[in-house]
Amino acid sequence: MTTLFIRRAISIRPIHPIQTGSFERGLRLLAAEAAATPTPSSGFSQPPTTNHFFRHWHCIGLSNSVIAGKPFVANIGDLPLVVWRNPANPNSISTTINICKHMGSKLDNAKITETGCLKCQYHGFEYTNTDTVGQTMEHEGKIFWAYNPYRSVPHNIPYYNDPEYKTSHLQFDMDASLIDSALNTMDIRHPEFVHSMGFGSNNPPQNIKQYTYKNTHTHTESLGLSFDYISNGVMRRLNDQTKITQNFHMYVYPTFSWSHVKFNEKSLIIGVNLLPLTKNRTRWFITIAHNYYKSDLGKRIMQGLATTILHQDYAQMRNQATESPLKQAILFDKVFKDEETVVRLRELFQKYQYPDIHMAAELYNAHKQTQDKSI
């Protein structure tokens, strides 16, 4: 078994030999991402001691949800955030904690001044761009937030900016934990049962290859899967009567996943950014990029197909047991063949801690110390 290296930052350990073009595409994407320079530390030698969760980029909303002149509320677990655009410069987006640091009023009803300040309605305290917490970025039609991020930009979705591809976004709240949501995105066995009325086939995936990736600069570990899938009758009509599609799935810990379905010269990419809302509720931000159809009607057809599939996932996610020590003890006592990737993903989540109010308080205390040192 060989180990490949793409730049020094990434080690790639294939579980099986490399044989598919989808995987080679994945390697090129990883190489490009390795070249991205991580954001330098801003006086923060170590992340919050509980875990590094807030240092990863988190999608907190779609771009069209954050409008000029109106505060936007987003929660990352128990961390309450308020986001606003500067009316004078709509490309300037700021974020702070949705608790006024004067006397504790919520800021989601604050006024946004002409100069781009967020003005608390209790006593008139104004938040300028020096009162922000963390970094906020608009990327590929979504709003991302991170505190002292490892990477300078969020991860890219393949082909998103390709002029030959149509793109669209969806948002779904699932009654399931972040862990269950993550495992679902990399599980290639459930479509036969959950998506039998969609793309699911009773023919199991073939030529499964499983891979792991590490980026030491950005403190991320990613998992990859490549496989061939036999289309059912419905999907063959969509896929120009092509019987077999080539597929590549990737999960970038802790909250980002994308999949690539390819046949002939056609490609469909589904990106999923996961946002934990509670311990057992997760928001899925779905990005669709494809060159199946060029028309707006074709774009709506693909959105409708994705919505149908998400409703099927929603029904299963509601049936997941809530997170508990008992569930963790039972999970994967039974493992099917070729499930090394989802088992490894579950192992990655052993270090995950739900971002509860104590972690949020620790983050703010560390932020406050950093601010005090800069004065």
Model features per residue range: what roles?
Residues 61-164, 368-375:
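Rieske [2Fe-2S] iron-sulfur-binding domain
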Residues 57, 69-73, 80, 133, ...:
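Short, acidic/polar N-cap/turn motifs at the starts of alpha helices
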Residues 58, 102, 123, 190-196:
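Histidine-centered active-site/metal-ligand motif
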Residues 27, 55-59, 71, 144, ...:
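Intrinsic-disorder/low-complexity, polar/charged segments enriched in Ser/Thr/Lys/Arg/Asp/Glu/Gln
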Residues 26, 31-81:
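Zn-dependent metallo-beta-lactamase
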Residues 1-18, 22, 34:
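N-terminal chloroplast transit peptides
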Residues 150-375:
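C-terminal catalytic domain of Rieske-type non-heme iron oxygenases
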